[in-house]
């Protein structure tokens, strides 16, 4: 997002419209959003990973650019946050005499596995590969595969690549990240076991209702 203000000199701030002041007010106002709008039973988080404005200490810049992400486990929470985010930003920009320009806005739905697909995979993988599947805690990484699962029933799994003997298993997006490539073999075997079971059994996925997701996907466009 880019906030446009009016540049000026630090000796006469009254002649400028500071996008920094505008962003600060917006940032603070957003802090209370979760307490006011998100059920305590649900989880929503957001962060700004980039804020850039100006390059001279005595000059008020004419624009500020910021970027970040929001994560949730309930699509309705994410879509509501998205709508309220833009409304709050517009209102505060109007108050300060600034304008906001949307540089990029993407929404990926929550990645939610279909239970019947999970049950089929668990059985098939146990028979063909062994007891290698584990349940995990919900994870807030954004995932484009969620778009596929919004149209077709399926499941999303992780392949274990941690091996303390080799020193692998550091968190993603860190300099220490590395993988134990032998884990990829198990991942391929597990994927094939699931695909073969799906082709052989051709289960009826009764819990998947594509029409239920239509409004959510339209709202996310």
Task: Show where each model-derived region lies.
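Short, mixed-charge aromatic SLiMs
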Residues: 48-54, 214-221
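Catalytic pocket of metal/acid-base enzymes, prominently hydrolases
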Residues: 34-36, 58-62, 149-164, 168
């Amino acid at each position: 997002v880019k906030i446009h203000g009016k540049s000026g000199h630090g000796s006469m701030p009254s002649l400028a419209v500071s996008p920094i002041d505008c962003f600060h007010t917006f940032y603070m106002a957003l802090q209370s959003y979760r307490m006011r709008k998100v059920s305590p039973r649900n989880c929503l988080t957001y962060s700004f990973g980039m804020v850039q404005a100006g390059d001279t200490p005595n000059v008020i810049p004419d624009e500020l650019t910021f970027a970040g992400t929001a994560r949730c486990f309930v699509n309705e929470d994410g879509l509501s946050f998205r709508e309220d985010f833009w409304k709050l930003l517009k209102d505060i920009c109007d108050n300060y005499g600034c304008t906001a320009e949307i540089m990029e806005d993407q929404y990926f739905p929550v990645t939610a596995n279909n239970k019947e697909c999970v049950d089929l995979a668990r059985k098939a993988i146990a028979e063909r590969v062994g007891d290698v599947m584990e349940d995990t805690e919900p994870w807030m990484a954004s995932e484009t595969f969620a778009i596929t699962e919004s149209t077709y029933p399926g499941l999303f799994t992780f392949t274990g690549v941690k091996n303390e003997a080799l020193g692998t298993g550091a968190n993603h997006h860190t300099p220490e990240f590395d993988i134990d490539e032998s884990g990829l073999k198990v991942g391929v075997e597990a994927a094939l076991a699931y695909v073969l079971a799906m082709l052989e059994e051709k289960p009826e996925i009764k819990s998947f209702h594509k029409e239920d997701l239509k409004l959510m996907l339209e709202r996310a466009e």
